[in-house]
Regions:
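Substrate-binding cleft of secreted/luminal carbohydrate-active enzymes
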Residues: 269-347
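Residue-level marker of positions within ordered structural domains that often coincide
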Residues: 29, 97, 320
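C-terminal transmembrane-bundle signature of multipass membrane proteins
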Residues: 53, 63-66, 340-347
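Generic recognition of flexible, low-complexity loop/linker segments
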Residues: 52-53, 81, 302-303
Length: 347
């Protein structure tokens, strides 16, 4: 049955790829993604493909996350539509999770129901701290506040921001959240610094732990440096542990980061490295590259291999949108990465 389903997916995927080449647009008017031609010309075959796709995703395979820039609320091209992402993605992480419009909500619903793609969003500790610092600086730079003290404590601010963001799950029916916290090593900290760091850890990851316990049906992925977290029990609750490796320059860098992360208390069977897609800026030859090769493809090859001390169960891709626009067909790098990790079984 597994072989049969995979061959159905492969065969129809070839047809869909052909139709996707025809539907690549270069106009700059607001557009709506066209339903692939095969869904109209042979709806029965397309329905079999979608059924096989969902069955495939419900089984064991390498997971793929894609970070998606949804800042364009009135898309000027198909590549800015949620519904245009590769069918074989498992999780789509929206970069702007608030104020979703009807089109976005409709597309989120469609890719989940038809293709089994779940939509998440990220809560990033560093960005919350940057927002707090910006608010504090703006307050202090305002001449009307001369002689006044900025009384908003960061810990209070952190709790409020994280809790408000988590409410987006129910507001917009997200399937879960990626919570990113770069815990710092406490080896060289003073006792005062250790206490302050543990307090922030306990707030951010404590909220994550409590939220997951109250929402067992939602997905929790944790990203950062798990080896530096004191209370590692939260990693038993999450489905995935994402290791950010955007700065990597080789497969060896990925292996090094994972080896550092997989310490006692960190499950070794939930590991997913996060790397960058190449930049849309053609002069940027570093982002998303290992020398002249693409980091996404190199990491996919690494994920496809067997490892003694841990399991790489998938791949996470930052700036996934950048891979859309190509002459031959859309999202070629992501499609190739998925094929590397989940090859068609030939019989």
């Amino acid at each position: 049955m597994k072989y049969y389903i995979q061959h159905i997916i492969f065969g129809i995927s070839v047809l869909l790829m052909a139709f996707s080449m025809e539907s690549c647009d270069t106009d700059h008017e607001p557009v709506k993604v066209k339903t692939p031609g095969i869904s109209n010309q042979n709806p029965e075959l397309y329905a079999r493909y979608l059924s096989g796709l969902r069955t495939y995703k419900s089984g064991k395979h390498k997971i793929v996350f894609g970070w998606f820039d949804n800042s364009e609320k009135i898309p000027a091209s198909q590549g800015q539509n949620i519904i245009a992402v590769p069918d074989s993605l498992d999780y789509l992480v929206l970069t702007l999770p608030e104020n979703l419009n009807d089109r976005e909500l409709s597309e989120m619903k469609e890719i989940k129901e038809k293709k089994g793609i779940h939509t998440l969003f990220e809560i990033n500790f560093i960005r919350i701290k940057e927002d707090y610092d910006a608010e504090k600086e703006a307050f202090e730079d305002n001449s009307d506040n001369a002689g006044k003290i900025f009384n908003l404590d960061f810990r209070t601010y952190l709790v409020d921001k994280v809790q408000k963001r988590l409410k987006l799950c129910s507001t917009f029916n997200y399937d879960g959240v990626v919570m990113t916290f770069y815990a710092k090593t406490k080896l060289y900290m003073t006792e005062k610094e250790k206490t302050a760091q543990r307090t922030l850890e306990n707030i951010f990851l404590g909220i994550a732990k409590d939220w997951k316990q109250r929402h067992p049906d939602k997905v929790l992925a944790l990203a950062g440096k798990p080896q530096n977290v004191d209370d590692k029990s939260v990693f038993d609750l999450c489905e995935y542990i994402i290791i950010p490796c955007q700065a990597s320059t080789s497969a060896s860098d990925i292996v090094y980061s994972i080896n550092k992360a997989v310490v006692e208390g960190v499950p070794n069977n939930k590991i997913i490295p996060l790397v960058s897609m190449y930049s849309k800026d053609k002069t940027d030859t570093k982002t998303g590259y290992w020398g002249k090769s693409l980091s996404v493809l190199g990491t996919a090859k690494l994920a496809a291999q067997q490892h003694t001390d841990y399991q790489i169960i998938g791949l996470a891709i930052d700036n996934a949108n950048n891979d859309y626009y190509h002459v031959r067909f859309v999202y070629p790098t992501i499609r190739e990465a998925i094929s590397i990790m989940n090859p068609i079984v030939k019989i």
